[in-house]
Amino acid sequence: MAEEVKWTDEQKQAIYEKDSNILVAAAAGSGKTAVLVERIINKIINEKTDIDRLLVVTFTNAAASEMRERVLKAIYKKIDENPEDERLQRQVTLLNKASICTIDSFCLDVVRNNFFEIDISQNFRIADTTEIEILQQDVLEELFEEKYESKDENFAKLINTYTGYRDDTPLKELILTIYKYIQSNPYPEKWLDEKIEMFNFNLEECKDFSQTSWGKILLKQIKEVVDDGIIQLKPEVQKLSECDDLKKSYEFLRGNLNQLELLQANLDTWDKAYTIYATMDFGKWTMDRNVKLDEKVNAQKVREKVLSTLKSSAEKVLIMDSNEAYQDIINMYDILKKLEGLILDFSQIFAKRKKEKNMVDFSDVEHFALKILLDENGNPTEIAKKYQSKFDEIAIDEYQDSNLVQEYILTSISKGNNIFMVGDVKQSIYKFRQARPDLFLSKYKTYKLKQDKTENDDLKIQLFKNFRSRKEVLDFSNLIFSKIMTEELGELNYTEEEYLNLGADYKDTGEDLKTEIDIITIDNKEDEEEPEELEVEVDENEDTQDEEFKTEVERKEDIEVEAMFVANKIKQLIDNKFQVYDAKAKEKRDIKYKDIVVLLRSTKISAPIFEKEIIKLGIPVFSDSSSEYLESLEIQTIMNLLKIIDNPLQEIPLVATMRSTIGGFTDNELVEIRLSDKYDNFYNTLLKSKKDVSEQLRNKINKFLEQIEMWRKEQEYLSLDELIWKIYNDTGYFNYVGLMRNGELRQANLKMLFERAKQCESISFKGLYNFINYIEKIKTSSKDMDSAKIIGENDDVVRIMSIHKSKGLEFPVVILANSGKQFNLQDLNSKILLHPELGIGVKYIDYDMQITYDTLSKRAIKNKMKIETLSEEMRVLYVALTRAKEKIIITGLAKKEKQDKMLENVEKYDELNIMLLSKAKSYLDWITLVHLYYERTMESLATWNVLQKEDIIKMCATQEPEKEENKNMAQKNLLLLKHKKADRIFNDQLFTV
């Protein structure tokens, strides 16, 4: 019999409290899902609430399914205890139609049930993401062609401003970027118009630029630099004052300090600060004769650094007075209004085309639902009031990842005091999906704890006990984040109130469970022979060319060394039978492969390298990175065949098919065919060559052409998916690829192609020609499709995955690898920056004068977005460290020069501050800063190892040489695991033709 759960006092509050809006701040591993399920059960059992009177909104479909299963299991348990309770039995039936779903599913339900309230067909369908992207490109082409033909003057000016007539792609990308961004706002067109109107100043009425939100941010930035400079100079001035021989140097440096203090005192007003900075003259430091130089030389170094930092910041900000700043912004108003018009034109045509195809995307569904639930004045409609009556409570899981549209929708159907929100703002890591952690934070600051709550207050509950991890994991995580996460950088003060507190009951396994940090130092000097370089991966939320933020090109050679080290670390854990605690068996056991995860910030570049090195040691591993599905051999082979079935005159696909396993022609045979007629199309040559080639080749050609002709006839009456599956059977190609290396994966990829074809038959890409065109457009849009996944969660393999994909998971041993990878801040250099409050940041562009530079509004937004991006990176690091149950291992590459520079910076400051933290370029930088400032505490919680790249290479070279059987062993292990699992993903009945 299972033990009864012992809920903490805080968990009990989250389960039983009611009659107000409730925000549950649930730290990592605090059992929030279990609490939410128990709250639902309590509503059903004790409060006699039927399950269909609850709306439970989850972040993913998988989470919704898990929630349903847990609730059903709990209901059955209660039925076992009370078999005569008919009401409980009825809940099982009601659960089938209960609203436990994602926000997308709920909105879809609202729209389908109320389609008559808006201008939409009852039979609309949800479009495939790729289909939407292709349609967007088609609409842009149509729109631009129309504008070119009509010689639209506004359009011509936009082309001049953003493309210079060389290529209109940048303008198209700009339109799509802004269009997609504004869809996360409840009223997209209104938001865009309001933010553009922020540029519509009356110059005569303008106040000091410091009165704008942009000016406040920029002056705050300068103040931080000036404050920091004063902190650094004061000790140097004091040292010089104590040395009689350095009187002249003292007076000179004192004068510099006075100027900084004067600027500091006037940073509340833009024009004062601008005027003072413009007249500042720090002079040239002359040498004192016959004096000791140590104090002066050090003071000179500090001064140069301070003035250099001030110059690099102020020269980008205090470059114009208020009038000039406003004038720059006003000058961009006209072009932005023209851009707005083009975006609205695109939006209207795009909406029209979707309507013609009777399709919508999920963004449409949300906005349709909003239109149904809120009237023009933002008040709940009669339909919304019906939903208010329908639901006794609205529970929102992962609330930190909500956006503003979802907030409006769920608030509109609430009674005003019946929303239960659970989440952890420290795990808000979906900024690129327009998640708004500020929604959580605003409630976190205003809702009251129970002891402080009055009748009209909303309630805040904190779940701070962690039931996932050992004390060693929690203590290390708490140390790191208590030193780096603040409201200024991190958007939350990580005080003791936020600490992860031990809740798990682990037994001693006799292992050293201190966090292990392994830094691999790499030489700064370039090798005589240039190593192979890898382009830096650009995620959808990344972009920067500014020297201050430039991401270094990652070198494949260096990543390989770190991957070697990680592979050996995993082998040591397995070979040494590292002990982990089995909570179910309540005893320790040997570690398994599946107990280990390698987490990477991004997987596209690094994951294949780590996978390769781990496989070399005979370790079964599964990498969850996106591979190039459309470039895989099996997909290219079938796509080439489909192309010639559609049109055999296409030479490249024809020759490729003939050379493939399906065609079976040798290179010599193809040359023989070509030589029979060098000038005609290859297909025509093939038809004519039958009389000019050997009998054996003639028979081969006849058989090939007959097969192609048969498929061409069959395509006229078979559906596309039926044709593809028939090709698999006719050629035996499906079975053939199953015998190749990674055969199960290749077969699963072919099944995915079949499924994709089946989907296209039901949408606007029906038929062979349209399907080929659909796939080609995916390629030209630089998109791809993920390869099939055929490894289950219980398979005994080491996993490599991104930190984002690990969210919600847990592993006994977490290896956070590539922690020295620099943050990608490239979005900060886009031509236009978009911010929910600060609006639009643009470059000042004068096409006629060939002048372009960032407006101050853009600089302010860039500054704000950098802080927000670093804050999100901090939260991503929090997610990574809190996946570990028993041990954390952190590895990363670092240049020795950079480590020395960090040590120099640390010596300048008495404590770790935001200036140092905001200059960090990687997770390893933050961890290193904590180590340097809190070395004694860190040493009690972590082992700090500095390794040389060359030593690791030697270590790996002196171990047992790589053997082919090691590779084969890893592959064999994977094949055994994968056996028959492709069929688990796809129902075989689907493929019966």
Identify the function of each model-found stretch.
Residues 101-107, 339-392, 405-406, 563-586:
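Conserved helicase/translocase P-loop NTPase motor core
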Residues 1-69, 122, 128-130, 138, ...:
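Conserved motor-region signature of P-loop NTPase helicases/translocases
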Residues 53, 172-360, 457-458, 564-565, ...:
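Conserved ATP-driven helicase/translocase motor core recognized via long
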Residues 118, 820-830:
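Cytochrome P450 core scaffold surrounding the K-helix E-X-X-R motif
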Residues 6, 19-21, 58-62, 72-269, ...:
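Conserved ATP-dependent motor core of P-loop NTPases, especially the RecA-like helicase ATPase domain
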Residues 95-108, 160-184, 339-345, 360-373, ...:
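Core structural elements
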Residues 826-867:
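Conserved catalytic motifs of ABC-family nucleotide-binding domains
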Residues 1-30, 34-39, 260-380, 417, ...:
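N-terminal accessory segments
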